[in-house]
């Protein structure tokens, strides 16, 4: 079957190019682009590969998922999408297998903790399983397209006239959130520049083009200005399993200053950023880049006397966060474990 061979080789090339892009840091892709591309590839794997039952398919998805995740462990969105697809396979198989919705209800925390060791039999063959899974993935892709709009639609509930809002760095989700609020409310945004990458400057330009009164300041001035701020609104790279954040460097400083002044800290993040990871997973948590922006090579005399590290992310503990705003509404950090059980199966937390 030359057609099938061509399709297989084309899919392999697409997966290879995606893996190579991940190894290089993902290029200019946003987390949403990563999620969409991962889902597209997984959908192609499901339709193009040969498999006879849900068990074989899940093993295939796990294998390809591990390969993608190994290319860039800090890009948690890829692993999250793999886990979502595994959950979809389990649900569609359960429906065809005759399991009732009542028995598939999300279990209590106690049951989730004590359910280890029980594994389901996925060896039965169902002809319509593939079409059902693909349809569910298509629905998930449609949901992904509307995540930013759904978060932005909640802006007027949280931002009021004449407020002073502080944010840090560049977040497309926060930008859309503030732009939506600015259509009906007048407020002032202070953007911390997020050195050494200084993405806050781009954020400030984008907001000022939208007619929002914007001020850029250095990260060192965060604490001094915080007493004037009504709310802190930030984005994040990942929401961890304990309700903490893995966000751009400087976010922890901002969160501590907000806590000291009892200023509410709101995190705008879509559900695909929710990860079953914990902060002690070293490989996937930390990411360091060249410290050239901090200590340029022109400082020749000092270079051999100093070891310089430039981390990309900060860890922000859950007790510093007031509210998460996602595409399904607002939730407290303590509710994250519940959302986790709705999105991912406990057996898929470690692929």
Swiss-Prot record:
What are the recorded GO MF terms, alphabetically?
A: ATP binding; GTP binding; guanyl-nucleotide exchange factor activity; translation initiation factor activity
Q: Quote the record's activity regulation.
A: Activated by the chemical integrated stress response (ISR) inhibitor ISRIB which stimulates guanine nucleotide exchange factor activity for both phosphorylated and unphosphorylated eIF2.
Cellular-component GO terms for this entry: cytoplasm; cytosol; eukaryotic translation initiation factor 2B complex
Q: Record's InterPro entries?
A: eIF2B_beta_subunit, IF-2B-related, IF_2B-like_C, NagB/RpiA_transferase-like
Q: Report the subcellular localization.
A: Cytoplasm, Cytosol
Q: Which UniProt keywords apply?
A: Cytoplasm, Initiation factor, Protein biosynthesis
UniProt GO BP: central nervous system development; cytoplasmic translational initiation; myelination; oligodendrocyte development; ovarian follicle development; T cell receptor signaling pathway; translational initiation
**Cross-referenced PANTHER family:** TRANSLATION INITIATION FACTOR EIF-2B SUBUNIT BETA
Task: Summarize the subunit comment.
Answer: Component of the translation initiation factor 2B (eIF2B) complex which is a heterodecamer of two sets of five different subunits: alpha, beta, gamma, delta and epsilon. Subunits alpha, beta and delta comprise a regulatory subcomplex and subunits epsilon and gamma comprise a catalytic subcomplex. Within the complex, the hexameric regulatory complex resides at the center, with the two heterodimeric catalytic subcomplexes bound on opposite sides.
Q: Which family does it belong to?
A: Belongs to the eIF-2B alpha/beta/delta subunits family.
State what this protein does: Acts as a component of the translation initiation factor 2B (eIF2B) complex, which catalyzes the exchange of GDP for GTP on eukaryotic initiation factor 2 (eIF2) gamma subunit. Its guanine nucleotide exchange factor activity is repressed when bound to eIF2 complex phosphorylated on the alpha subunit, thereby limiting the amount of methionyl-initiator methionine tRNA available to the ribosome and consequently global translation is repressed.
Protein name according to UniProt: Translation initiation factor eIF2B subunit beta
What's the encoding gene here? EIF2B2
């Amino acid at each position: 079957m030359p057609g099938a061979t061509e399709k297989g080789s084309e899919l392999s090339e697409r997966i290879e190019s995606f893996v190579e892009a991940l190894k290089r840091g993902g290029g200019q892709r946003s987390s949403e682009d990563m999620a969409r591309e991962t889902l597209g590839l997984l959908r192609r794997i499901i339709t193009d590969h040969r498999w006879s039952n849900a068990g074989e398919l899940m093993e295939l998805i796990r294998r390809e998922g591990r390969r993608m995740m190994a290319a860039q462990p800090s890009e948690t969105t890829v692993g999250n999408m793999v886990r979502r697809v595994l959950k979809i396979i389990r649900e569609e198989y359960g429906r065809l297998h005759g399991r009732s919705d009542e028995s598939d209800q999300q279990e209590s925390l106690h049951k989730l903790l004590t359910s280890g060791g029980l594994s389901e039999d996925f060896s039965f063959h169902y002809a319509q399983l593939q079409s059902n899974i693909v349809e569910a993935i298509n629905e998930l892709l449609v949901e992904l397209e509307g995540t930013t709009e759904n978060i932005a639609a909640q802006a007027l509930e949280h931002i009021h006239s004449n407020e002073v809002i502080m944010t840090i760095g560049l977040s497309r989700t926060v930008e859309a959130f503030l732009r939506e609020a600015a259509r009906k409310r007048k407020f002032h945004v202070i953007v911390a520049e997020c050195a050494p990458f200084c993405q806050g400057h781009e954020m400030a330009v984008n907001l000022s083009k939208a007619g929002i009164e914007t001020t850029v300041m250095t990260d060192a001035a965060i604490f001094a200005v915080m007493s004037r701020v009504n709310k802190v609104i930030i984005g994040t790279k990942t929401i961890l399993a304990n309700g903490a954040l893995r966000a751009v460097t400087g976010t922890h400083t901002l969160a501590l200053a907000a806590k000291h002044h009892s200023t509410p800290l709101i995190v705008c993040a879509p559900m695909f950023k929710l990860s079953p990871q914990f902060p002690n997973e070293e490989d996937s948590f930390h990411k360091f880049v060249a410290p050239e922006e901090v200590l340029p090579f022109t400082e020749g005399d000092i270079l051999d006397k100093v070891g310089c590290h430039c981390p990309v992310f900060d860890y922000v503990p859950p007790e510093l966060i007031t509210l998460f705003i996602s595409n399904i509404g607002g939730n407290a950090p303590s509710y994250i474990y519940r959302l986790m059980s709705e999105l991912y199966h406990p057996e898929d937390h470690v692929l």
